[in-house]
Design a protein with these regions (language model features):
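Short beta-strand His + acidic residue motifs that chelate non-heme Fe in jelly-roll/DSBH
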Residues: 50-53, 70-71, 79, 93-100
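A short, N-terminal "cap"/entry segment at the start of jelly-roll beta-barrel domains
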Residues: 1-36, 118-138
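Short acidic-glycine-tyrosine-enriched beta hairpin
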Residues: 74-91
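Conserved short histidine dyad/triad with adjacent acidic residue
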Residues: 25-27, 40-55
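Glycine- and acidic-residue-biased ligand/ion/polar-headgroup-sensing regions
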Residues: 56-69, 73-74
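A short hydrophobic beta-strand segment most commonly corresponding to one strand
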Residues: 60, 87, 101-120
Length: 138
């Protein structure tokens, strides 16, 4: 058994190369072979967001607190809130982050390929895309 103590975990500010605004991350687990699981709590200040990116094995987001946004390339922005789960299929270009006026945190879970490939990063999300009216919540 391995217990990863929270007191040994460091909060990291995420780089401007892949994020807009102030974004923090706490890595919860980085699996060792044969596991390929990676999980992090990511906290976004209002307006903070990822750049467009994709994951070869997909990604799952579990919303912990606040209000956020997520968008798949070519689809309408979706509002997401605490308790929501977002399942992102493999190789789907997307972004996620906080609403313009709310803090937002989620647990981000993904796996690497057996070759160690993880996140593929693309361009930053434009303010026009980010500020688009979200789809109605159903």
């Amino acid at each position: 058994m391995t217990v990863l103590r929270s007191s040994n975990r460091q909060t990291k500010v995420q780089p401007a190369t892949n994020f807009t605004g102030v974004v923090f991350s706490d890595e919860i687990v980085q699996g060792s072979a044969p596991s390929r699981m990676r999980a992090s709590v990511v906290s976004f200040t209002p307006g903070g967001r990822t750049a467009w990116h994709s994951h070869p094995v997909g990604q799952t987001l579990y919303c912990l607190s606040g209000a956020g946004r997520v968008q798949f390339d070519g689809q309408q922005v979706q509002e997401i809130r605490a308790g929501d789960t977002v399942i992102i299929p493999p190789n789907t270009r997307h972004w996620h982050g906080a609403a313009p006026d709310k803090l937002f945190s989620h647990l981000a879970m993904s796996e690497q390929t057996d070759k160690g490939e993880g996140t593929a990063w693309f361009e930053h999300v434009s303010d026009t895309d980010y500020n688009a009216k979200p789809a109605p919540v159903t």
